[in-house]
Amino acid sequence: MPITSKYSDEHVESILTEIAAVLNKHNASPELTLMVVGNIATNVINQNVAAAQRKVIAEKFAQALVSSLQS
């Protein structure tokens, strides 16, 4: 069952394009890119999610990431 997002594909793709341009500008390796993305996710969770819910949200995020990977 596909997941429906409240954000348009165009909006998401626009942000991804801008972020990719910044990473390219800094010649970020895949390892550095993943480190930056992980730090962003951690900061978003820590700054916007109640402490009691952080682990649950992080686990759901991790599950969504694994589900999105191509086999």
From Swiss-Prot:
InterPro entries: UPF0352 (IPR009857), YejL_sf (IPR023202). Gene3D superfamilies: YejL-like. It comes from the Bacteria. Coiled coil: none annotated. Pfam families: DUF1414. Belongs to the UPF0352 family. HAMAP family: UPF0352. This is UPF0352 protein VC_2040.
